[in-house]
A protein has these predicted regions:
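Short alpha-helical donor nucleotide-sugar binding micro-motif in glycosyltransferases
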Residues: 83, 259-260, 267-272
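Conserved acidic donor-binding segment of nucleotide-sugar-dependent glycosyltransferases
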Residues: 312-313, 317-324, 333-338
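Short hydrophobic beta-strand element within catalytic cores of glycosyltransferases
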Residues: 297-300, 310
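Short His-centered aromatic/hydrophobic patch
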Residues: 93-99
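Aromatic "clamp/platform" in nucleotide-sugar-dependent glycosyltransferases that forms part
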Residues: 280
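Conserved donor-binding/catalytic core segment of Leloir-type glycosyltransferases
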Residues: 4, 190-208, 214-217
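N-terminal strand-loop element at the rim of the active site
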Residues: 5-13, 17-73, 162-167
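Donor nucleotide-sugar binding/catalytic pocket of nucleotide-sugar-dependent glycosyltransferases
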Residues: 57, 139-185
Length: 372
């Protein structure tokens, strides 16, 4: 089967990593995959997709975004040429800005078998009527990355499996998967009494709650001198966070790693005992399952898909969104109870297997075979 995957950008984000997982799953399933990037891309990410066995077509020669009617015409011409040359059996659209436009264009150009995946919950959309129209009249399957997200879009949710009944129009949940560079630990993680490392592995942006991390760490540092903070990532909040650390007198206890290659992340997770995810919006929480796979105890905000991924009190802890005091309280409960921390870590290692690449690949390959 020949499959066209379309995506607005190929940069360094969770959506690109999960779409790369999709490519790997389909190629391993014996399918021919063409990935079309409309706008921005990095040569490194394009190379990752090519190394996974897909053909990559970047429509924008300058890696720039084109808006308005010019953008619509640009997409129409690009997609028309690809459909003429490649003749795919199925198109799989990653639903991000420019949203439904590529879906309408593919339908206009005669593409009937269309799958759409949205990588967020419905809270970022002011109006869902367009998405409901797309799901009911334009695509065969609309997939979401958590059941909470699916319910927020459509009012009901179903986790897809091979026994799921397919209708003419469908919506399901298929969970994201661990990337190939992160493996589930076979041995239990050990926790030291002498030094405890809190960590963030994230884009350093306000939407990820990064402005809350240093204030929370500074409050804890006053009582727990053994703790340190490892910051992996970069973004617009980095300078702000560094200024906070200096102002609050904790900069000597913070290690700034900057943006890291995917291949380096596993060893960095292994240095983290308690992984912080104070996001203001989170469709799934890929960082959470990556951390759990390495035995980290995740402390995350109660927002978006995180409560579904981080089972509160079972494999990690949740705190109220934008609440530094509650975040501090949850971390403190771990620092005060080493036995509980170890148990949550062990539970996480068992629990995270449901997000394995094998399960993800089986689900999507089965879905493709059934709708073609």
């Amino acid at each position: 089967m020949k499959i066209l995957i379309t995506i607005p950008c190929l940069l360094t984000g969770g959506t690109e990593i999960q779409t790369l997982n999709l490519v790997r799953a389909l190629v391993q399933g014996g399918h021919q995959v063409i990935v079309t990037c409309y706008f921005e891309y990095t040569p490194a990410m394009v190379q990752c997709y090519q190394n996974s066995g897909s053909k990559v077509i970047c429509l924008s020669p300058n890696s720039t975004r084109i808006g308005g009617w010019k953008g619509v015409i640009f997409l129409f011409k690009g997609l028309r040429e690809i459909l003429r040359n490649e003749r795919p059996d199925i198109a799989h659209v990653q639903y991000m800005a420019p949203g439904a436009i590529p879906i309408f264009l593919l339908r206009l150009l005669g593409m009937k078998n269309i799958i759409v995946t949205t990588h967020t919950a419905a809270d970022i959309y002011p109006n869902l009527r367009l998405i409901h129209f797309v799901q009911k009249y334009c695509v065969r399957v609309f997939t979401c990355i958590t059941m909470r997200a699916e319910e927020s879009f459509f009012g009901s949710a179903e986790l897809y499996n091979s026994d799921t009944i397919l209708k003419r129009r469908n919506h399901f949940t298929i969970y994201n998967a661990l990337p190939p560079n992160i493996h589930i630990r076979e041995e239990q993680k050990t926790f030291s009494d002498k030094e405890i490392t809190l960590g963030v592995v994230s884009r350093l942006e306000r939407i990820k709650g990064m402005d809350l991390v240093i204030p929370a760490f500074a409050k804890l540092k006053k009582q727990y001198t053994v703790i340190r903070l490892l910051v992996v990532g970069d973004g617009s909040q980095r300078i702000i966070m560094q200024d906070q650390a200096i102002e609050l007198g904790v900069n000597d206890s913070v290690e700034w790693m900057g943006r890291q290659e995917q291949s380096h992340l596993q060893s960095l997770y292994d240095r983290v005992d308690i992984l912080l995810m104070p996001s203001r919006s989170e469709g799934f929480g890929l960082t959470a399952i990556e951390g759990m796979a390495r035995g980290c105890v995740v402390v995350a905000s109660n927002i978006g898909g995180l409560p579904e991924v981080v089972k509160d009190g079972k494999v990690g802890l949740l705190h109220q969104t934008e609440d530094v005091e509650d975040m501090v309280a949850q971390i403190q409960s771990l620092l005060e109870n080493r036995v509980r921390t170890i148990q949550l870590s062990r539970n996480a290692l068992l629990y995270v297997s449901q997000f394995s690449f094998e399960k993800y690949a089986t689900a999507f390959c089965n879905l493709y075979e059934r709708i073609n």
